[in-house]
Structures are given as C-alpha cells and as structure tokens.
Amino acid sequence: AKDGDFEGPPGCLKMGELCKGGTCCTKVYKYWKWRKLECLGKNDGWFKKKFICDEPCNPXX
C-alpha cells in the first residue's frame, strides 16, 4: 500500500470529505500504516457542526 490508498465499499468517501448521509471508506493508508476512518462531527463556526470522514482521535482535525 502507499499513502493515499483507501479501503472500503465502492464509491466510499475519502478522508476530509463531507459525510452527512454518506459512507466513509473504512481505512486510509497514511504515514506508513492503515488508519481507521469514521464520519465525525466537527465544530464549524458558531453552534454548527459539519460531518467529515476523519481518523478518530485525530488532533488535527
């Protein structure tokens, strides 16, 4: 595998993509290892949330 490779169902959403109602890929290969992807709610301005595919517990996040 190489950086940027994804695993998951066909047409799955990649890291950083908005995932409200969509399906994130299950894994992304980043920094020499497979990492889990989930649809996570991030604060987006005041009292708003956006849901993006990201690695759980990713501080940059």
Swiss-Prot record:
The keyword Secreted applies. Gene3D superfamilies: 2.30.130.120. Transmembrane segments: none annotated. GO terms for cellular component: extracellular region; host cell presynaptic membrane. Pfam families: m_DGTX_Dc1a_b_c. Disulfide bonds join 12-25, 19-39, 24-53. Its main location: secreted. Expressed by the venom gland. One of its GO terms (molecular function) is sodium channel regulator activity. The keyword Disulfide bond applies. Keywords: Disulfide bond, Ion channel impairing toxin, Knottin, Neurotoxin, Presynaptic neurotoxin, Secreted, Toxin, Voltage-gated sodium channel impairing toxin. It is found in: Secreted. Acts by delaying the inactivation of presynaptic voltage-sensitive sodium channels (Nav). Acts against insects and causes a progressive spastic paralysis. The presence of a 'disulfide through disulfide knot' structurally defines this protein as a knottin. Belongs to the neurotoxin 26 (DTX) family. This is Mu-diguetoxin-Dc1c. It comes from Diguetia canities (Desert bush spider). The lineage of its organism: Eukaryota, Metazoa, Ecdysozoa, Arthropoda, Chelicerata.
